[in-house]
UniProtKB/Swiss-Prot annotation:
InterPro entries: SCP2_sterol-bd_dom, SCP2_sterol-bd_dom_sf. Gene3D superfamilies: SCP2 sterol-binding domain. This is SCP2 sterol-binding domain-containing protein 1. It comes from the Eukaryota. The lineage of its organism: Eukaryota, Metazoa, Chordata, Craniata, Vertebrata. Residues 44-156 form the SCP2 domain. GO terms for cellular component: cytosol. It comes from Bos taurus. Coiled coil: none annotated.
Length: 156
């Protein structure tokens, strides 16, 4: 944030700029609109819609590599606000909102800020899991395959 503004004026055609004309600014105030990168419950929706598009395009390849159904319960303040399923076991793959239609192989319960950091590559999934930042039930080792899917999506 700026601390001061320097004004330079030219009074007459032959004169140079007038020196020492600064405007000192007081302490900055908080913006009325929150920072655009602040996490809200709506940030996961475009991410999953984009992942869904990726699965539609390369899903058959992912089904061969992964062969699993993942359910992600996104939480905020300890309550589930979004539930998404990434089915990479049946057909050519699918991503949809809601609980898994068939039994999920792995269920992740993860706070939204942690999910966003993981998906953006700012946090190591193994370290976050071991630190207790999110919970996994079912086949825990399949989480490594989901991590590869997310990395593949990030390159896409």
């Amino acid at each position: 944030m700026w601390k001061r503004i320097d004004h330079q004026l030219k009074i007459k055609a032959g004169d140079g700029p007038q020196a020492g004309q600064f405007k000192e600014l007081g302490p900055g105030r908080e913006p009325a609109v929150p920072h655009p990168l602040s996490l809200s419950e709506f940030q996961t929706v475009p991410v999953f819609e984009d992942i869904s598009q990726h699965v539609k395009e390369v899903g058959s390849q992912l089904v061969k590599k992964v062969n699993a159904i993942f359910q992600l319960d996104i939480t905020k303040d300890g309550k589930t606000v979004h539930q998404w399923t990434i089915d990479l076991k049946n057909g050519s793959g699918d991503t949809y909102r809601g609980p898994a239609r068939l039994p999920a192989d792995t269920v992740f319960t993860i706070p939204e800020p942690v999910f966003m950091e993981l998906i953006l590559g700012k946090m190591n999934p193994q370290k976050a899991f071991l630190a207790g930042k999110f919970k996994v039930s079912g086949k825990v080792l399949l989480g490594q395959k989901l991590e590869r899917v997310f990395k593949d999506w990030a390159k896409w």
